[in-house]
Amino acid sequence: MMLEPSIDKLLDQVDSKYSLVVLEAKRAHELRDKERPTKEFKSVKRTLQALEEIADGTVKIHPAPELKRETLVEKRELERLQAKMKEQLIKEQIAKEEAEEEAKQKNSRAAKAAAAE
């Protein structure tokens, strides 16, 4: 049974088998955590999907790991802020709808009181 992509093709993309295993594991974890894929996959398993991306050259070892960590921290902070903003917008929309509903009820009561007089 021949595995695709072949180890030779994979080793053309990285320096060593060790680097390949580390890159594959990290990318598989990223894919599991809903990181955006770089292509359509033939495989269903995350580890094989990571190998497909490595073989295509769309995933590389980051030359500056500290910079990548900073980028990831910034990305997570941005996602957190976006979620917070979305939550705030929803709260504002709810407050607006409640105020409109309260105004309608107030007008309805006023109309009923005027009709009763």
From Swiss-Prot:
Gene3D superfamilies: 3.90.940.10. The keyword Transcription applies. Its EC number is 2.7.7.6. Transmembrane segments: none annotated. GO terms for molecular function: DNA binding; DNA-directed RNA polymerase activity. It catalyses: RNA(n) + a ribonucleoside 5'-triphosphate = RNA(n+1) + diphosphate. GO terms for biological process: DNA-templated transcription. Residues 96-117 are annotated as: Disordered. Keywords: DNA-directed RNA polymerase, Nucleotidyltransferase, Transcription, Transferase. Residues 108-117 have a biased composition (Low complexity). GO terms for cellular component: DNA-directed RNA polymerase complex. Belongs to the RNA polymerase subunit omega family. Promotes RNA polymerase assembly. Latches the N- and C-terminal regions of the beta' subunit thereby facilitating its interaction with the beta and alpha subunits. HAMAP family: RNApol_bact_RpoZ. The RNAP catalytic core consists of 2 alpha, 1 beta, 1 beta' and 1 omega subunit. When a sigma factor is associated with the core the holoenzyme is formed, which can initiate transcription. This is DNA-directed RNA polymerase subunit omega. The gene is rpoZ.
